């Protein structure tokens, strides 16, 4: 990715700190946590919480940007405590997930920021600790003082702060 910045193919990227080349400038945007999302018509939608047994017994949907992956951060957290879940659907975008959840009894674990404004869905805390993540914005020294780029980075930081839940 460093080469893409150096050649001007990428101006700003939203990354996690772990995936950011150390040669780039960075700015923290937000810290994210995970929640469970399910249809308001799901049999467990009236619960204030899900037990670990209930959670593991459900059919789950997973978002995997390359598509087809049936294993994610939730599965790593479950494996650490000797448990597993049943992922029966993998989609490549969070954009399609809410509609799928509305019309099925699938449960999904999603970043909390993406569970805001989801009519017909219920948000519940996960029954186990699922490590969240941080998002940062990164840019190359080539554009560090460029007024247009500074403006863009300020707008991105401002928008990241306005998303509250």
Task: Specify the residue positions occupied by each region the protein language model found.
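Short beta-strand-centered segments that line the small-molecule binding cleft or hinge
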Residues: 1-38, 120-126
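Structured helix-beta-strand junction loops
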Residues: 8-9, 32, 47, 57-58, ...
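Secondary-structure junction motif
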Residues: 44-46, 50-52, 58-81, 145-149, ...
């Amino acid at each position: 990715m460093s080469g893409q910045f150096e050649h001007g193919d990428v101006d700003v990227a939203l990354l996690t700190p772990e995936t950011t080349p150390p040669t780039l400038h960075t700015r923290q945007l937000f810290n994210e946590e995970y929640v469970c999302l399910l249809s308001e018509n799901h049999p467990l939608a009236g619960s204030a919480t899900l037990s670990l047994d209930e959670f593991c017994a459900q059919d789950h949907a997973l978002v995997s940007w390359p598509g087809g992956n049936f294993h994610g951060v939730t599965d790593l957290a479950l494996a650490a405590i000797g448990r597993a879940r049943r992922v029966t659907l993998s989609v490549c975008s969070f954009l399609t997930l809410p509609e799928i959840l509305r019309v099925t009894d699938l449960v999904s674990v999603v970043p909390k920021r993406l569970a805001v404004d989801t009519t017909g869905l219920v948000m519940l805390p996960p029954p186990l600790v699922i490590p969240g993540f941080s998002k940062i914005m990164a840019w190359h020294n080539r554009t560090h003082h460029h007024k247009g780029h500074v403006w863009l980075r300020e707008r991105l930081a401002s928008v990241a702060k306005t998303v509250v839940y």
